[in-house]
Amino acid sequence: MKANQTTETIHIAPPNIKNGKVWIKGTAPLVVHKFSDKAKNMIRAKQEAGSTANTKKKREAKDFTEVFNGARHISFDGWDGIPAPAFRNACIRACSLVGFKMTMAKMSIFIEADGFDATEGTPLVKIYGKEPRQLESMVRLATGVCDISVRPQWLEWGACLRFRYDGDQFTAEDVINLVHRAGLQVGVCEGRPGSTNSNGCGWGTFEISDEASVRALEKEGGAK
């Protein structure tokens, strides 16, 4: 070691990961839109067919009920859910409202899954509410062609968010307040106000609630 050279010791504290949960209730309708398995299979079949896929084929009739059910995230246990990353992303986006670095938030807050999508394995948060209605909306595709988009919509809904967070970055109260901001100012799923592609449709917003109020939605005929 050279004369007068000093050494510096770096101390890394162990992870201070904590857990919590909060019940939420929708303040606006929720619209979910899963990329259907049928659409994925059609794309795969076309790619497997190669050049022969360019031959003209008869256009298959559109089964609106099938499209509606294909747009739902249904777990292995049969209940409808919202992708858990949707809530995490909303919380991370809400950090920009309070001056907290989103890059730090990405490593500091996580939403636990209640289950997984039965066909694609997406982590899901269970929806409490009545069975969704079939929403049919006129949309314009990227090609400029008009189409009818068929999606499930819950007019009343709720959920229980189980979260993990870095206790050196947030307190439990911080996370709950962040979830509240995410619900009122960012939203989740289709037509949310915090969408990066549009100004939203006034859907997907929520507020902090309590277990009794959210479970009451289930008793009215929602997820089992």
Predicted features and spans:
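RNA-interacting cores
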Residues: M1-K224
